[in-house]
Swiss-Prot record:
UniProt keyword annotations, A-Z: Cytoplasm, Plant defense
Name under which the protein is recorded: Nematode resistance protein-like HSPRO2
Superkingdom field: Eukaryota
Source organism of this protein record: Arabidopsis thaliana
Signals that turn on the gene: By bacterial pathogen P.syringae pv. tomato. By Salycilic acid (SA). By the bacterial elicitor flg22.
Subunit structure: Interacts with SNF4.
GO cellular component: cytoplasm
PANTHER family the record matches: NEMATODE RESISTANCE PROTEIN-LIKE HSPRO1, NEMATODE RESISTANCE PROTEIN-LIKE HSPRO2
Function text: Positive regulator of basal resistance.
Keyword Protein biosynthesis: no
Location(s), subcellular: Cytoplasm
Length: 435
């Protein structure tokens, strides 16, 4: 029970005709209040499984491309480089799907899903570029006059099988980059005559293309092998970008640049949603061919809470870092955690919400909770995806006898932000008593 009389006094001047409240408003609040380390159900699979996953996707080679710094003065390069490389790999997926001659493949739905996924990626790239301009660093971006000569997209826009989708992508780039000072330079119209980003120098499409084959390409005769490989390379590229974005969010909060952190935290939410859309592409793979590939690649559960996604060290780290944003709430609210477990944080949050004088902080806290929702949704959706692709027996095999599987534990965990949750509970109860 918590005394809410201070809140009544705080807002009473704004509500002269409101019904009189009792001197004390008592509400039941979620527990616990005290921020304590929460045992996380997420951890990497066995080292041998993680290593096999990395070698299959050629992640060590990709990581060198993601982490290369060709333009040290350009502060957005660590985020935009892997993002643009994810986009380029997506063009390779379009090429692979359009080249697939199997008569039983749902090409129409593939085209729709790829259009949607690439559009969302372009929107996210454009949002990152727009934020550069707001922060006054767009001048650092490497631009030039020429278009890309190495990207696959111009070829997709002229090849008969992919022409419609390729031209649609070019139109999307033109539209989404309209608010930026430069454009991507992939063959879009660019009627405004804006400078082109030095796409080839940043993205290195030729080096990306050199990684087009996985180690099993020569001795596994299964078209879904290439599809699976490309899908996960796109996924891992965005995961790498998110790690750099999370580091930037933490730095911005520590420097009290809450507006910048707010912009970035919503970009992070979008990345989680893009990851879910990438995973959903698995549903378009042929069921029998996919299960045959699973056998050929010797992919199997160990039966010890070993969901397949936990073989990605990057994804596990991304989830942990997203969850650890909860530790930055006291810094945002400018109060210290009460060592006795008192309601110091939630009271500060309620005052922040009510006064509305520090909007950047409100937006940041809302964004943090949006990231939590998106991350938990990703793992919930992934659990359903595994069951749909491989059967529920496969999903149940990852659960131990003592508890439910790790994926279920993730989205069933209590909120990562109990103080914000309690503050909103109080405010909701307060306003409900005014009516």
């Amino acid at each position: 029970m918590v005394d809410m009389d201070w809140k009544r006094k705080m807002v009473s001047s704004d509500l002269p005709n409101s019904p009189k409240l009792s001197s004390k408003l008592h509400v039941t609040i979620p527990s616990p209040f005290k921020i304590v380390p929460v045992s996380s159900p997420i951890s990497c699979s066995a080292p041998a499984l993680c290593s096999a996953y990395e070698l299959y996707l050629r992640l060590p080679e990709l990581r060198k491309l993601w982490s290369s710094r060709d333009f040290p003065q350009w502060t957005s390069e660590p985020i935009l480089k892997p993002a643009l490389q994810a986009l380029e790999i997506s063009f390779r997926l379009v090429f692979a799907v359009c080249s697939d001659t199997r008569p039983y493949i749902n090409h129409r739905e593939w085209n729709r899903r790829l259009d949607s996924l690439i559009t969302k990626q372009i929107q996210l790239v454009a949002a990152i570029c727009e934020d550069e301009e707001e922060e006054g660093i767009s001048a650092e971006a490497p631009v030039g006059g020429g278009r890309s000569s190495l990207s696959l997209l111009p070829q997709l826009a002229t090849w008969r099988r992919s022409e419609a989708l390729g031209k649609k992508i070019l139109y999307t780039i033109d539209n989404e980059m309209s608010r930026c000072k430069y454009t991507l330079g992939l063959g879009e119209q660019n009627i405004a005559g804006k400078p082109n980003l030095r796409y080839d120098a940043i993205c290195r499409p030729n080096e990306i293309y050199s990684l087009k084959d996985n180690p099993y390409a020569d001795h596994i005769d299964n078209h879904e092998n290439q599809t699976l490989y490309i899908i996960h390379q796109i996924l891992e590229s965005w995961i790498y970008a998110s790690g750099n974005l999370l580091n930037r969010i933490v730095s911005s909060i520590e420097e009290e640049k809450f507006g910048k952190a707010s912009n970035d935290v919503y970009l992070l939410e979008k990345i989680w949603k893009i990851l879910a859309e990438i995973e959903d592409l698995h549903m378009l793979m042929d069921p029998e061919d996919f299960l045959k590939l699973k056998k050929q690649l010797q992919i199997k559960s160990t039966g010890k809470n070993d969901a397949f996604c936990f073989r990605s060290k990057g994804l596990v780290e991304m989830m942990k870092m997203s969850k650890d944003l909860r530790q930055k709430v006291p810094a945002v609210l400018a109060v210290e955690v009460d060592p006795t477990g008192g309601p110091r944080l939630q009271e500060a949050a309620m005052k922040l919400y009510a006064r509305k004088t520090e909007c950047d902080k409100i937006h940041l806290l809302q964004g943090m909770q949006a990231v939590e929702a998106a991350a938990k949704s990703f793992f919930f959706g992934y659990r359903q995806l595994v069951a749909a692709m491989m059967g529920s027996a496969e999903m149940n095999a990852t659960a131990s006898q003592e508890s439910c599987d790790s994926l279920s534990q993730i989205f069933m965990e209590p909120t990562y932000f109990p103080s914000l949750d309690a503050a909103k509970t109080f405010l909701g109860e307060f306003w409900s008593h005014l009516g």
